[in-house]
């Protein structure tokens, strides 16, 4: 078991006290190896050692010593330092820059370890067979949805995108089961996105969701859920990091689709030529 990954996967299920313990561990995993149960409860600011016991039992472990052994193994396997350091007002430009870059790289690698390859394969098949691909997302997710709309259009897929609810409603009114809805929402709880996914399912249309919450309301109306794995800090929200990870997931689907379809490369070359004529 990769206990650090396990903590991240179960984070949303933790109580407030357990989240404090998780945050303390993730911020300094090496330091926890040298700590006792009482040390950890004190560092985390929880009332009793019983909270720590409940925490490691929720991970499926029998003792704090077993937890520390698995934690040490997780650290030894890590390709780079496992930290989600928060930005401080005392940090200089170099330190803040390094923290942001490391957090983003860490989030990408964590999501890679978390992703189900079968879900990626199924998503590629849905993209390949879709008559039309409808991308939806609002606020920060709209930028990701538009980027995907642009990419997949260039390899010849019939794509639609809008961040206007009225236009999306009109598009879905004429959609069919042979179309595909791709819903992008970090929380998975944006009311309009959930409603559009629900509408798509009522029409027997497949839905692929990219979200940071596998157990969200949106996920319930999805055929495939591709979940990101990011962590929020005091200044930088996890939604900021998840946007980058969402783009990487869509880049992966795009590359797999293009690599398996000779027509995609041909269409990409055509679109490159067309765009080049618009430049000096």
UniProtKB/Swiss-Prot annotation:
Q: Which InterPro entries match?
A: Homeodomain-like_sf, HTH_RpiR, RpiR-like, RpiR-like_SIS, SIS_dom, SIS_dom_sf, WH-like_DNA-bd_sf
**What's a BP term from Gene Ontology annotated to this protein?**
carbohydrate derivative metabolic process
DNA bind region: 37-57
The record's annotation in Pfam families points to: HTH_6, SIS
GO molecular function of the protein, one example? DNA-binding transcription factor activity
CDD domains recorded: SIS_RpiR
Q: Which UniProt keywords apply?
A: DNA-binding, Transcription, Transcription regulation
On the tree of life, the source organism's domain of life is Bacteria
Q: Where is the HTH rpiR-type domain?
A: 1-78
Where's the SIS domain? Answer: 123-263
Name of the protein this chain belongs to? Uncharacterized HTH-type transcriptional regulator TM_0326
